[in-house]
Curated annotation (Swiss-Prot):
Function according to Swiss-Prot or TrEMBL: Quinone reductase that provides resistance to thiol-specific stress caused by electrophilic quinones. Also exhibits azoreductase activity. Catalyzes the reductive cleavage of the azo bond in aromatic azo compounds to the corresponding amines.
Cross-referenced InterPro entries: Flavodoxin_fold, Flavoprotein-like_sf, FMN-dep_NADH:Q_OxRdtase_AzoR1, NADH:quinone_OxRdtase_FMN_depd
Signal sequence annotation: none
Gene: azoR
Family the entry assigns: Belongs to the azoreductase type 1 family.
Domain of life according to the entry: Bacteria
GO MF annotation list: electron transfer activity; FMN binding; oxidoreductase activity, acting on NAD(P)H as acceptor; oxidoreductase activity, acting on NAD(P)H, quinone or similar compound as acceptor
Protein's name according to its UniProt entry: FMN-dependent NADH:quinone oxidoreductase
Note describing how the cofactor binds: Binds 1 FMN per subunit.
Amino acids binding FMN: S17, Y18, S19
Oligomeric and partner information: Homodimer.
Length: 199
């Protein structure tokens, strides 16, 4: 039985949110494939990540105030992480960026002291990560602004041994204009099932 930490980082209300609907679909199919796994659900919008942000003014107390150690412990206790995030101004949502700020901590989730070549060594090397992302533009439309690639690189930096994505791109295109997010997402059920089997 695997322990799975499910992190929702969407910005919109659930019914209108492609990322929330994609997350729900992936989790539903994941449970079908892995019925004995234990899932813990967290909406990052209901945590300190929606209240306390890293800045010069908060630097001295940020990691304590945002409960960094609590979240790092959750990552260390989990076998898998499923994280959902929509693109916001060419990057991840603020709560997802803030979550990464709170857990990317030297000598806790990565370290340079074990490196032989000067590069960082990720300490979360037990984790398998599924990144569920959405964006209005087509895939790779903004090569300089891919929240998906940023998240892939970040989790690999932190040492995750497996990182995959379940993506919905182009939600602002005319092909989706007359459809509700739920109906659009349902078209990806088979993809979700295949991803869940591999994860």
């Amino acid at each position: 039985m695997a322990k799975v930490l499910v992190l929702s980082g969407g910005l919109s209300e659930k019914e209108k949110s492609y990322s929330s609907q994609m997350l729900d679909l992936f989790v539903k199919t994941y449970k079908e494939v892995h019925p004995n796994d234990e899932l813990e659900f967290v909406d990052l919008n209901t945590t300190k990540h929606a209240e306390v942000f890293l800045s010069r003014n908060t630097f001295a107390t940020y990691w304590k105030d945002v409960e960094s150690d609590k979240w790092i412990d959750k990552l260390k206790a989990a076998d898998k992480v499923i994280l959902s995030c929509s693109m916001t101004n060419f990057g991840p949502t603020a709560v997802v960026k803030n979550f990464i700020d709170s857990v990317a901590v030297a000598n806790k989730t990565f370290s340079y002291k074990y490196s032989k070549k000067g590069d960082a060594v990720g300490l979360l090397d037990h984790l398998r990560v599924m990144i569920v992302t959405t964006q209005g533009a087509p895939k790779d439309w903004y090569l300089w602004g891919s929240h998906t690639n940023w998240l892939i690189g970040t989790w690999k930096f932190l040492g995750a041994k497996y990182v995959d994505t379940f993506e919905l791109n182009g939600t602002k295109l005319s092909v989706f204009a007359d459809k509700k997010p739920y109906d659009v997402v349902e078209e990806f059920r088979q993809d979700a099932l295949e991803k869940a089997k591999q994860f």
